[in-house]
Regions:
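Conserved beta-propeller blade signature
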Residues: 122-126, 177-183, 234-238, 297-301, ...
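Ser/Thr/Pro-rich low-complexity tracts
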Residues: 1-84, 141, 205
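Blade-level signature of beta-propeller repeat domains, shared across WD40, Kelch, NHL, RCC1
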Residues: 417-453
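Short loop/turn segments immediately following the C-termini of beta-strands
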Residues: 59, 119, 127-131, 183-187, ...
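Gly/Pro-rich loop segments of beta-rich domains
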Residues: 10, 78-112, 147-166, 187, ...
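Residue-level detector of Asp-centered blade-edge/turn motifs that repeat once per structural unit
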Residues: 116-121, 170-177, 228-232, 291-295, ...
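A short loop-to-beta-strand structural motif that recurs across blades of beta-propeller domains
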Residues: 136-142, 190-196, 243-249, 306-310, ...
């Protein structure tokens, strides 16, 4: 038994000594033959050799001789591998993006943040930024796994004052209805920072509803992220220009949800204003907000300074953050290194998702944090204790010396990404989805039997 890439010796008679004349299939898949002697063949287990039947064929001139299928089957063990869900690299970039089936949807442009619909876990949303180096996104896209379709759920022209949607979250009102919360980045202090959208039944989308009635609920500049606390319902959002974290209390968000309040809130000291909670560090710290599912703490991913902060929740709000991994460094300094705490190095840690680790069952924290390391072209794992390891990417070393590119296959040996940004986890089958920005694709990390190349 074993997985793809394992060495196998097949014993028999009259094999000869020329590997070019030998063909071996395992589970119907052709196995690379490394060497052969009269009584033994040395080969490598191919991918997707699920059924395990072993067949040997020998060529001799015009004749082809096939041995009987071996009575003993190879017990193939599936691997977790990287492949593509949808999208395509295109010189046109965003101009080639279109709605359509997974296998014909054009490019996926600048997928910077990904999350699931809270009421239908077959709908995966993608916030596409329309204003940075990875291209012009389309707004908020939907990957519909029921219908295997990609479509634009909220076009970028629906955003007031900015087309740079950076994050998506959801607020559940007192009546049990969900509202989409979208963080928008722009430079005018009087323009949009956060918008709210309502779920509207009907319409032409395959999922049977749309997100509409968009309205501005927060005005400020430089919002890089907006997130709802999972237990208090308060809204937290970031500010780039002054590196501040703001909070808007739940009752204010509830009033926007019900229509009681229509005037956007702005930073201030009043109870119903956007209150300053803390300062991350210096000016122009670009940081994403990733709140733990329990709400006990949040990671502030300081994208342009290449490190990650942790801020603990004291029951009322988040407290002064401290470094959990990486080192504050110049924004264009990208170093790749696994390690613990400040021994680890990143190249734009962009976004992340908390993933349950069965080995932590019963611990105070049962989650690892999987994150996209944008300029290191890798998916990294941050443990609760600050250990950083590389999960996927930077493979296929035989191609060239670059860590970036497009390659599917085994997590570390083969797979390559090119500026990954968004990431989501499907708890049902333990699958990871990655917004691979410069490959214009959504990549999938899961068991190979479940993956369509």
């Amino acid at each position: 038994n074993g997985a793809a890439g394992q060495k196998v010796l097949i014993y028999g008679e009259n094999f000869g000594n020329d590997p070019s004349l030998i063909e071996v299939t395992i589970g119907g898949q052709k196995a690379p033959v490394v060497n052969v002697q009269s009584t033994v063949i040395y080969c490598i287990v191919p991918t997707k050799a699920y059924s395990g039947e072993i067949q040997v064929t020998i060529k001799q001139g015009e004749e082809i001789y096939s041995a009987e299928v071996a009575e003993v089957k190879f017990e193939y063990q599936r691997q977790v591998v990287v492949s593509s869900l949808c999208g395509a690299t295109s010189e046109q970039g965003s101009n080639s993006a279109k709605d359509g089936p997974f296998n014909d949807c054009g490019s996926i442009t600048n997928p910077c943040f990904m999350t699931w619909d809270p009421e239908d876990h077959n709908l995966l949303y993608d916030a596409e930024d329309a204003g940075d180096a990875e291209g012009v996104g389309q707004g908020i896209r939907c990957f519909d796994f029921t219908n295997k379709q990609v479509y634009t759920m909220i076009p970028k022209n629906s955003f007031v004052g900015s087309q740079r949607c950076r994050t998506i979250d959801f607020y559940k009102d007192d009546n049990g209805k969900y509202h989409m919360i979208v963080g928008l980045a722009q430079g005018n202090v009087n323009s949009t920072a956060v918008m709210m959208f309502d779920r509207i039944e009907g319409g032409t989308k395959p999922c049977g509803f749309t997100w509409g009635n968009g309205r501005v609920i927060v005005q400020n500049q430089g919002c890089q992220a907006a997130a709802i606390h999972p237990t208090t319902g308060d809204l937290y959002f970031s500010n780039y220009q002054n590196s501040l974290l703001y909070r808007v209390k739940k009752y204010v968000i509830e009033e926007f949800a019900t229509g009681k309040r229509t005037t956007p809130v702005r930073p201030g000291t009043a109870d119903d204003a956007a209150q300053t909670i803390l300062k991350v560090q210096d000016k122009e710290w670009e940081f994403n907000i990733m709140i733990h599912p329990t709400g006990k703490y949040a990671y502030f991913m300081v994208i342009n300074r290449n490190y990650i902060l942790r801020s603990d929740f004291n029951g009322e709000t988040f407290t002064a953050p401290y470094v959990i991994a990486g080192v504050n460094s110049n924004k264009d300094t990208y170093i790749y290194q696994d390690g613990v705490g400040n021994q680890a190095r990143f190249g734009n840690p962009y976004s992340g998702v908390f993933v349950k680790n069965p080995e932590y069952a019963g611990n105070s924290d049962e989650y690892d944090f999987y994150l996209t390391d944008r300029h290191n072209h890798a998916i990294r794992i941050l443990s609760p204790l600050g250990q950083v390891t590389t999960y996927a990417g930077r493979g296929s070393a035989s191609l060239n010396s670059n860590p970036w590119g497009y390659a599917n296959g085994r997590l570390r040996e083969d797979a390559r990404f090119n500026r990954p940004k968004g990431i989501a986890w499907d708890e049902r089958d333990n699958t990871i989805y990655v917004g691979d920005a410069n490959n214009y694709r959504i990549r999938k990390i899961g068991l190979e039997e479940d993956i369509n190349e």
